[in-house]
Amino acid sequence: MHPLELFKYCPKCGSSHFVVNNEKSKRCADCGFVYYFNSSAATVAFILNERNELLVCRRGKEPKKGTLDLSGGFIDMYETGEEGVAREVLEETGLKVEKAAYLFSLPNTYLYSGFLVHTLDQFFLCTVEDATHLEAMDDVADSFWMPLDKVNPEEFGLDSVREGVCLLYT
């Protein structure tokens, strides 16, 4: 099912005459409003400690519960990518990001509450203030440092994270 099929009413006037305009938008036949279905912005953090180990998390919730992941998540309104990745790292691990340097982005899909969300995942290389006080919080079941030679991209559950790990470490 195309994500636009789930939108039945115009978000501007509430009309049920909300019809497909093209493959990425719907148009209201009553008020003329055009809604474009765009990707949601998300972040992913590559964090290395002083032993050159990668910070890895285990997903505590679906999708892909129990698989490996990197810290990150959706960017809130009015946040920059750097602010979003710093907030997500703090919420999930308790670590405070000192610096976030943009690396690259990858498209992804993410099943959230039964709804397929298209995302644009922005990858950052982050440094943290103190890597010794690591916790697993929020939607993370576990977080730990993994030696780079033990990193196996196939153990990462989300497609974009797996691809990002491949780009950076293989």
Residue ranges and their predicted role:
Residues F18-V19, Y36:
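Short functional micro-motifs and their immediate structural scaffolds
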Residues Y169-T170:
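Conserved small/polar residues in nucleotide/adenosyl-binding loops
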Residues E135-V165:
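NUDIX/MutT-family hydrolases
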Residues N49-E91:
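Conserved Nudix-box catalytic region and its N-terminal flanking loop in Nudix hydrolases
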Residues D30-L54, F74:
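Conserved N-terminal beta-strand and adjoining loop/helix that marks the start
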Residues P3-F7, K24, A41:
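Short metal-coordination and nucleic-acid-contact micro-motifs, chiefly zinc-binding Cys/His arrays
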Residues C10-C13, C28-C31:
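Short cysteine-rich clusters marking metal-coordination/redox-active sites
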Residues F104-T132:
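Active-site-adjacent beta-strand/loop module that shapes the phosphate/pyrophosphate-binding cleft
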